[in-house]
């Protein structure tokens, strides 16, 4: 059986209100098929944060994993950059 490589995404934390769960906004650019203009697209992912270490504004790296719940199938790998303290 062939082993598949897990998908990794990098994004910004937009919500940390849930216990052990963060919402990560992942942005990407893609080219419009007809006009050729680059368009910014985004998606929100729910990720498992075991130690509740993330705060809003952090830049994080998440990896796809087994389902933790109905909508949570990603897991926090590392905090790339902490948000500036206000």
UniProtKB/Swiss-Prot annotation:
The keyword RNA-binding applies. Keywords: Ribonucleoprotein, Ribosomal protein, RNA-binding, rRNA-binding. GO terms for cellular component: cytosolic small ribosomal subunit. It comes from the Bacteria. It holds the Pfam family Ribosomal_S17. SUPFAM superfamilies: Nucleic acid-binding proteins. GO terms for molecular function: rRNA binding; structural constituent of ribosome. Signal peptide: none annotated. Belongs to the universal ribosomal protein uS17 family. One of the primary rRNA binding proteins, it binds specifically to the 5'-end of 16S ribosomal RNA. This is Small ribosomal subunit protein uS17. It comes from Marinomonas sp. (strain MWYL1). The lineage of its organism: Bacteria, Pseudomonadati, Pseudomonadota, Gammaproteobacteria, Oceanospirillales.
């Amino acid at each position: 059986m062939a082993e598949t490589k897990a998908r990794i995404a990098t994004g910004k934390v937009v919500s940390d209100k849930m216990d052990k769960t963060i919402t990560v906004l992942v942005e990407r650019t893609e080219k419009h098929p007809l006009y050729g203009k680059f368009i910014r697209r985004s998606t929100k992912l729910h990720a498992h944060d075991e130690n509740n270490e993330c705060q809003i504004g952090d830049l994080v790296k998440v990896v796809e994993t087994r389902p933790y719940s109905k909508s949570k199938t990603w897991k926090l790998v590392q905090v790339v950059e902490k948000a500036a303290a206000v």
